C-alpha cells in the first residue's frame, strides 16, 4: 500500500508512493481542496494535466448539498463528479466544530445547525464512515474534534479522549466495511498543544493499526514555533512504515517544515484562497498583483511556468482583471498558484532524491519565511 523509495540522509524527509484504488499517488503529495468535488474555478482537466492523482472533498458540505442520497444514486462521488482519480474525504469535523455556538458535542457524536438553512443534524463516527463508504472514498478520515489553540488542559484532555473513542468506533466500522469496498482509513491523532496528550493519542491510535495516520489540530492559529514543536514531537512517535498526513497546511514554508519531519501528505485551501485576492506564488515570494507597480507591466508573472496565465497573459492584464473583480482573473490566478504548488513539490522530490533537501529548504525559506499568507 505504501512504499518509501528514498530517505533523505540529512533529515526525515522521504520520497515514496501510495497505491490507492484509483491509481498511484507519489509522495510528498500536496492535495488540492475540492470541497464540493471540484476546485473553485478550475476544471478537472487542469488538475489532470498536472497529473494530480489525489483531491480532497468534504463530507460535511457534500452531506448538506447535494446530499448523500443524490451521490448514492450516481454510484458514488467519482461518478457524480467524473473525477477518475483518487478522493480523500475529510469527515467535516473541522467545519462542524468551527460552528461553535451552532453545535453540541456528546460522547456519541455532535449535533449541529446547518449554515445553509438552519436545520439540525447529528453526526456520529459510524454515520460519517458510512457516508464516505457510499462516496467510494479512496481515503476516509474519521470524525474527530479539532480543538482550538489556547484551551485549557482539562478541555483538551476531554476532546482527546472523545476523539480516541470515536476513532475506535470508526475503526470497528472500517473492519466491518461492505464487501468490495477497498478504500483506506487514516485515523487522526489529536491532543491540542500538550505533549502528554499527543503521546497518549498517538499510542492509542497506533494500537488500532489503521493503514495511515494523520496529525490533526495544528496550524489552527498557534505561533509557528508551537506548530513546529508539536509537528516534530508527533512525527517522531509515528512508525516509519505508515503514510503520514498533516491536515490543513499548504503554505510553502509550512510544507517544507512538514516534509523535513517526514510528513507525506498535506492539504490547504490557501493557494486558491490567496489567488482570489490577487496574491500569486512565485519563486521570489508572493507577488501581490493589485499593487500599482504592475499596472503597465507587460512581462509574464513567472518564467518556466506552464499555466495559462504565464504562457499567454501579462501582469498588467491580470492586475486589470483582479482590480475589476472579473471572474476570469480569479481563475487565472488560481490555476497559476496550483501549478506553482505542483512544481514546488516536484522540486522537493528531486532535492530529496539527490540528498539536497536541506540546502533547498534553507534557500527557499529565505524568500518565504516572513511572507504574510493572509493578505
UniProtKB/Swiss-Prot annotation:
This is Queuine tRNA-ribosyltransferase. Homodimer. Within each dimer, one monomer is responsible for RNA recognition and catalysis, while the other monomer binds to the replacement base PreQ1. Pathway: tRNA modification; tRNA-queuosine biosynthesis. The lineage of its organism: Bacteria, Pseudomonadati, Spirochaetota, Spirochaetia, Spirochaetales. Substrate binds at residues 90-94, 144, 190, 217. Catalyzes the base-exchange of a guanine (G) residue with the queuine precursor 7-aminomethyl-7-deazaguanine (PreQ1) at position 34 (anticodon wobble position) in tRNAs with GU(N) anticodons (tRNA-Asp, -Asn, -His and -Tyr). Catalysis occurs through a double-displacement mechanism. The nucleophile active site attacks the C1' of nucleotide 34 to detach the guanine base from the RNA, forming a covalent enzyme-RNA intermediate. The proton acceptor active site deprotonates the incoming PreQ1, allowing a nucleophilic attack on the C1' of the ribose to form the product. It catalyses: 7-aminomethyl-7-carbaguanine + guanosine(34) in tRNA = 7-aminomethyl-7-carbaguanosine(34) in tRNA + guanine. Binds 1 zinc ion per subunit. It comes from the Bacteria. One of its GO terms (cellular component) is cytosol. GO terms for biological process: queuosine biosynthetic process; tRNA wobble guanine modification; tRNA-guanine transglycosylation. HAMAP family: Q_tRNA_Tgt (MF_00168). Its EC number is 2.4.2.29. It comes from Borrelia garinii subsp. bavariensis (strain ATCC BAA-2496 / DSM 23469 / PBi) (Borreliella bavariensis). Transmembrane segments: none annotated. Belongs to the queuine tRNA-ribosyltransferase family. Coiled coil: none annotated. Pfam families: TGT (PF01702). The active site is at residues 90, 267. Its cofactor is Zn(2+). Zn(2+) binds at residues 305, 307, 310, 336. Keywords: Glycosyltransferase, Metal-binding, Queuosine biosynthesis, Transferase, tRNA processing, Zinc.
Amino acid at each position: 500500500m505504501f512504499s518509501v523509495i528514498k530517505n533523505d540522509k540529512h533529515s526525515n524527509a522521504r520520497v515514496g508512493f501510495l497505491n490507492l484504488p484509483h491509481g498511484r499517488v507519489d509522495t510528498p503529495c500536496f492535495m488540492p481542496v475540492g470541497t464540493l468535488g471540484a476546485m473553485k474555478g478550475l476544471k478537472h482537466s487542469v488538475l489532470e494535466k498536472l497529473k494530480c492523482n489525489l483531491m480532497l472533498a468534504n463530507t460535511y458540505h457534500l452531506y448538506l448539498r447535494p446530499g448523500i442520497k443524490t451521490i448514492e444514486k450516481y454510484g458514488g462521488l467519482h461518478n457524480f463528479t467524473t473525477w477518475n482519480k483518487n478522493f480523500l474525504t475529510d469527515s467535516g469535523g473541522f467545519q462542524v466544530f468551527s460552528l461553535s455556538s451552532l453545535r453540541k458535542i456528546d460522547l456519541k457524536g455532535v449535533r449541529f445547525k446547518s449554515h445553509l438553512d438552519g436545520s439540525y443534524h447529528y453526526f456520529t463516527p459510524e454515520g460519517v464512515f458510512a457516508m464516505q463508504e457510499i462516496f467510494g472514498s479512496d481515503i476516509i478520515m474519521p470524525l474527530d474534534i479539532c480543538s482550538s489553540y489556547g484551551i485549557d488542559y482539562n478541555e483538551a484532555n476531554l476532546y482527546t479522549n472523545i476523539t480516541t473513542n470515536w476513532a475506535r468506533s470508526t475503526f470497528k466500522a472500517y473492519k466491518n466495511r461492505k464487501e468490495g469496498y477497498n478504500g483506506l482509513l487514516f485515523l487522526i491523532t489529536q491532543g491540542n498543544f500538550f505533549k502528554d496528550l499527543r503521546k497518549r493519542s498517538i499510542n492509542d491510535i497506533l494500537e488500532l493499526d489503521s493503514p495511515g495516520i494523520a496529525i490533526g489540530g495544528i496550524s489552527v492559529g498557534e505561533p509557528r514555533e508551537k506548530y513546529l514543536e508539536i509537528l516534530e514531537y508527533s512525527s517522531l512517535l509515528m512508525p516509519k512504515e505508515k503514510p503520514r498526513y498533516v491536515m490543513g497546511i499548504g503554505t510553502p514554508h509550512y510544507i517544507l517544515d512538514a516534509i523535513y519531519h517526514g510528513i507525506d501528505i498535506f492539504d490547504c485551501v490557501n493557494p486558491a484562497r490567496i489567488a482570489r485576492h490577487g496574491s500569486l506564488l512565485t519563486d521570489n515570494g508572493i507577488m501581490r498583483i493589485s499593487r500599482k507597480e504592475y499596472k503597465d507591466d507587460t512581462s509574464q508573472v513567472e518564467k518556466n511556468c506552464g499555466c495559462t496565465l504565464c504562457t499567454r497573459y501579462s501582469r498588467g492584464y491580470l492586475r486589470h482583471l483582479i482590480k475589476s473583480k472579473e471572474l476570469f482573473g480569479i481563475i487565472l490566478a488560481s490555476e497559476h498558484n496550483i501549478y506553482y504548488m505542483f512544481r514546488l513539490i516536484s522540486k522537493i522530490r528531486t532535492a530529496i532524491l539527490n540528498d539536497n533537501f536541506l540546502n533547498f529548504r534553507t534557500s527557499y525559506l529565505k524568500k518565504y519565511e516572513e511572507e504574510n499568507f493572509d493578505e
